[in-house]
Amino acid sequence: MTTLIIFIKNPKLGKVKTRLAVTVGDEKALSIYKKLLDFTQKLAISLSCERMLFYSDEIEINDNWSNVFFKKNKQHGNDLGERMKNAFQKALLTSKKAVIIGSDCAELTKKILENAFDSLEKNDFVIGPAEDGGYYLIGMNYFEPSVFKNINWSTAEVLPKTLEKIAHLEKKVVLLPTLSDTDNEEDWKKIAHLLM
């Protein structure tokens, strides 16, 4: 069995896309984030796999993420690395392969996600590099917590540091195409047409 893990922030005014909100305002930032959530949801449903949705703050029972398609969870941990580690640990209890994505990459496609899962047949890890030096996706076919430890999240060192850890483990990794996340107004202008 394969599992897609999706990390989202609860869509609340003033709490999402804060860097984007600096130039477009909180309401527009929330509106953009909701579009990204809708895009991510449709993409996830198009795949044949288990889907585990992890909310940042609280599980929302009656939102538009259907309980039929998504197993709902709350993120746990002191930083992003710990939260991802805990999500992978849970997913890999029942799955042979798991891949995690966030909800701010509108360039992500079904084909890229299918390639991510397929590549885990013969490789231990798969990573989708983001243009900002982080990643929009990471996947593994066994639980390896060390790849999430001692990393300065939301910096340009995330990807190189993660690759260094995988090399140290002497494991095989595949890199997917480099895509951009939507963090600021410039990013939004580049991808807005994909969500119209």
Predicted regions and their residues:
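Conserved alpha/beta core of the MobA/IspD/sugar-nucleotide pyrophosphorylase nucleotidyltransferase superfamily
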Residues: 164-196
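N-terminal nucleotide-binding beta1-loop-alpha1 segment
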Residues: 1-19
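Conserved donor-nucleotide/metal-binding helix-loop-beta segment in metal-dependent transferases, i.e.
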Residues: 106-135
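Short, glycine-/small-residue-rich phosphate/pyrophosphate-handling segment
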Residues: 144-165
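A short, N-terminal amphipathic alpha-helix
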Residues: 31-49
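Short aromatic-hydrophobic micro-motifs that form the base-stacking/packing surface
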Residues: 99-101
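Acidic donor-binding segment of Leloir-type glycosyltransferases
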Residues: 46-71
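Short phosphate-binding loop-to-helix
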Residues: 65-97, 155-158, 186
